[in-house]
Regions:
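Short beta-strand edge/turn micro-motifs at domain boundaries
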Residues: 2-10, 106, 127-161
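Acidic/histidine-enriched, glycine/proline-rich intrinsically disordered or flexible terminal extensions
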Residues: 156-186
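Short, conserved clusters of charged catalytic residues that mark active-site
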Residues: 34, 92, 129
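Flexible, membrane-facing loop/turn or short amphipathic-helix motifs
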Residues: 117-121
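Short, low-complexity N-terminal intrinsically disordered segments enriched in polar/charged residues
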Residues: 2-41, 45, 49, 53
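A solvent-exposed, acidic/Ser-Thr-rich amphipathic alpha-helical stretch
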Residues: 48-116
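Outer-membrane beta-barrel transmembrane domain signature
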Residues: 123-125
Length: 186
């Protein structure tokens, strides 16, 4: 967000997405992408502390059925995830960044989330977008707002192959603290 990357008062990526961003903008994009990844991991590992860590305490979310403080959502959603799904995977991609200043950014990201139901016989697949707002305070970026936009969702029957054939010997994932990523990333 240096002056050379601004066109008519807007950040360069708003009006010319091919313009190479400056170092400050690249650093901001990296921090924001890291937050998006940590948000997905927190949902998939049923980690309320990790989810709260990506939001400022005053942040709000709009998840359709829940509209309110993000930290309250973090406490509520973990029970819902653990009570309905054996495993989830939230994949975020195609993020578009819109910097309104050096300390404020709005993003649109595509989300593709798979949810293996507790019975192991079906999965719910969600495709949508996250409309997020981020702020940098004292050199730290965090989310201030998230709205989930649903493009489509479907439920599919699955055949669980985790214990069969060449998959039998693989380490199995979990949404609990027994997942190997907890010790791997410690």
């Amino acid at each position: 967000m240096s002056e050379e990357n601004k066109v008519g008062g807007k950040m360069s990526n708003d009006v010319n997405p091919g313009l190479v961003p400056g170092v400050t903008e690249l650093q901001a994009r990296s921090a924001i992408a890291d937050l998006l990844n940590h948000h997905s991991r927190a949902l998939d590992r049923v980690d309320a502390v990790g989810l709260k860590a990506v939001y400022w305490p005053s942040a709000t979310v709009d998840y359709g059925g829940f509209k309110g403080l993000a930290h309250d959502f973090a406490d509520i959603v973990m029970g819902a995830l653990a009570g309905q799904y054996e495993l989830t995977q939230h994949r975020v991609s195609n993020t578009v960044f819109n910097f309104s200043s050096e300390v404020a950014c709005s993003t649109e990201s595509y989300v593709f989330a798979k949810h293996l139901l507790l019975d192991g016989q079906s999965e719910m697949v969600f495709s949508g977008r996250y409309l997020d707002q981020f702020e940098q305070r004292a050199g730290v970026w965090k989310m201030t707002f998230r709205r989930v936009v649903m493009d489509w969702s479907r439920r599919l029957a699955v055949t669980d192959e985790r214990q069969g054939g060449s998959f039998a010997a693989l380490t199995k994932g979990s949404n609990q603290k027994t997942d190997p990523s907890w010790t791997h990333l410690a």
